[in-house]
Every structure is written in structure tokens, then in C-alpha cells.
From Swiss-Prot:
Catalytic reactions of this protein: UDP-N-acetyl-alpha-D-muramoyl-L-alanine + D-glutamate + ATP = UDP-N-acetyl-alpha-D-muramoyl-L-alanyl-D-glutamate + ADP + phosphate + H(+)
Binding-site residues, ATP: G115, S116, N117, G118, K119, S120, T121
Main location as per UniProt: cytoplasm
Top-tier EC class: ligase
UniProt-listed GO biological process terms: cell division; cell wall organization; peptidoglycan biosynthetic process; regulation of cell shape
Organism of provenance: Aliivibrio salmonicida (strain LFI1238)
Protein's recorded name: UDP-N-acetylmuramoylalanine--D-glutamate ligase
Amino acid sequence: MTGFGGVKNVVVVGLGMTGLSVVKHLLRQPEALIVKVIDTRETPPGQEQLPEQVELHSGSWQQDWLLDADLIVTNPGIALASSQLQPAIKKGTPVVGDIELFAWAVTAPVIAITGSNGKSTVTDLTGEMANAAGVKTAVGGNIGFAALDLLEQDADLYVLELSSFQLETTSSLKLKAAAFLNLSEDHMDRYQGMEDYRQAKLRVFDHADVCIVNRDDKETYPDTADKTLISFGFDTSDEYGCIEENGRLFLAKNNTPIIAANELGLVGKHNIANSLVALALLDAAGVNTNKTLDTLKRYNGLTHRCQVVAEMNGVRWVNDSKATNVASTLAALSGLSIEGKLHLLVGGVGKGADFSELSPALNELDLMMYCFGEDGVQFMPLDPRSRLCQTMDEAIELLSPELTFGDMVMLSPACASFDQYTNFMARGDAFTALAKHYSTEK
């Protein structure tokens, strides 16, 4: 199914920003669709923006609507395996997500990025670089704007971040280039295991002209041999990698230097990889990357991702709230340069993760670890230099008297936020406010 042929009744599951974008898009179609919305929340966000002709059922599921639908457009947070969707699926009703609707409508080239970690940075950076090269580019998907809202920008290139959840309900998205950055344990409360999770991610390559894969993570390679691959890694390579010349490390293509690593606006080894991917994606999409190097030099990253939010008396406060899994926190720890002690804040909702992978990195650092939230206690056995707190506020109140010149306070929780916060952004904003408060205290 790649269009609305034969469709009359459409049920949208889940409102919010994405759900509203779906409703608006459906009502713009010439087929005069009848659109209904189901949201299990009593007062769904965005309900006041629904047009009068769109009926809303809130507070519970509405099975009759689902069984009568010709098409169901579901929120990425709802698994296809859920008992509520299964009766309609077994009946043969198509169930898609907003990215599939985007695929039906888009006419300009599209680039997509997925992976366990780094995808937001790569997506944002790729968009910035493309715009700098003179290509009118729209960026969104799992970051910023909902994909369907991007269509209103009438861009010449679309750059999408796609989560595994979004890819589950996407089957016809044609891409000029797609990148699978890395694979590490995440969302084990949703998937049966790592291979199930990997297969969801690999769907990004289904209709991609070029597949960007990680030489240091073979799990990112497609299972079939009929794909055009371009790889990136930290080694010397005929593709995208690193070389050393005159004692300096350079990002390179075909063993030819592109830009020195110490000229990048982003810091940390993982951001060398992120920059290589952005270059590979744009090159595959036909964008002149020579015009993008100044952007690589000035781009300093996303809010909530290893972002210095306050600095006073030699103490830096770093907001890495977007580190919602173990691999993200490991990446943050591997790129650190600290004169004094690291005060690390971890915890939240662990999503079934194995936190023991953090132990080797923790052992290498002079630190105190403050464990808070629903699964904070699970971090305590990892290191004897740990303290258990109920909340992040309590943790910062505890550590603030101990701060000295050269120390760093870092929120890199390795967990989701929804036990105590609406989302990772709200958690990061709360940390930033606390950082500024304690940095200015007399």
C-alpha cells in the first residue's frame, strides 16, 4: 500500500505534535477522508487544535473504531504487537506511521539516519551542512519538526532522524542515502532481544540508494549483499576514515585529508565519527561537501547533548540529558578531559538495560556518582563511590558543597526520564536551572 486508494475511514492513534501533523495531512488529501482520533490520555496534548469535523475518543481505546477503519495511523510509541492493535491487524487493516505517510507524499530527495546513539547530532549537523552548501534543507522526524510538517517547507532535500519505533511502521520510504550509526542495547522493554531491535533499525536500508555503515560495528551492515555500501570508521580506509599527517589527526576520504580533527567544533572521539557520517551522507546525496567545512568548524552540538550550561570558579556543569541509554553515557565518558573530580548524575527509568557495562569506564575516572530516580539503586553496585538520592535536586544539593576548581558536574543518566520528568528535555532544563543557580550562589 503506497497511497489512499480505497481508503475512506482513517483512525489516528495518539495525538500530540505527531498526531496533529497526521490529522492536518490527512485532511489536506483530495479523497475527503473521514478522520477519527483515539488517545488513551484523558486530556491529550493538542486536542484543542483538532478541527471540528475530527471526532476524538480519549481516556481509553475504542476497538469499534479500529475494526471499522480502512487505515490506522499509529504513534511510534505503540508497538504493533500490542493487544489493542492486533485484532485490526489480523483483519488485514493496514497500520502505518507518520513516516510512511511522508513517504507517500514527498517528491524531493530524502536522507535518513538511525542508530542507538548519535543520530540527533548527525541529523542536525547534516542539515546545517546541506543548508550551508546552498541546498534548501528541512530537518525533522524524531527530532524537532514532525516529518509531515516538513512538507510545508517545500525543501530541496529532507534530512530525517528515524527511530526503530518509526521504522517498524515504515515500508516504502525511498532514500538517496541512509546511515545506521551503531547498535547497542536499548528499548529491551519493547523488543524480544537485540536481533529484533537490529532488524527494526535495518528497515532504513530497504529502499536506500546508498547505505552508510560503521566499520567498527558490523551489526550495522545489511543482511543482504545487494546493497551499495559506504563505510566509516576511525581507521585508515579507502572510504571514510582517519589518517595522521605531521602528528595531526585528519578526517579523510580515500586516504585524502578533509579537515583536521582538532578543527571540529564538536569535541570527543564519537563526534569524529558523527562528522564522517554527515560528510558521507551529503556526498552520496550529491551535495558539494567542500562548501560545508566551515560548518564543521563552528557547529558545537545540540542542546542536552554534552552541552556546557554553566561554568563558575573553574567548575563546569555539563547537560547530557539526551543520554537515555548506557552506550550514550559511555560515549560521553570516553571523551572527557577533566582536571579535577567528575560528579556524575545517573538514573531514571532503565528500560531493562544492563548497567554493568559502565563499570570499566567508571574505574578509570576520579569521580563521585549520584544515583537517583526509579532505577537509581541499580547503579549503586557498579562503584563504591556512589550515593543514592531520590531526585536530581537532592543529588545536586548533596554534591555542591564539595565542588572545587577543575571539577565537572555531568548529568548523563543512561536512563529514560519519564519517572520524574515529561521527557529528557525537561530533565535537561531542570539540570540547567540548577546548574545556573548553584553556579551563581555566593
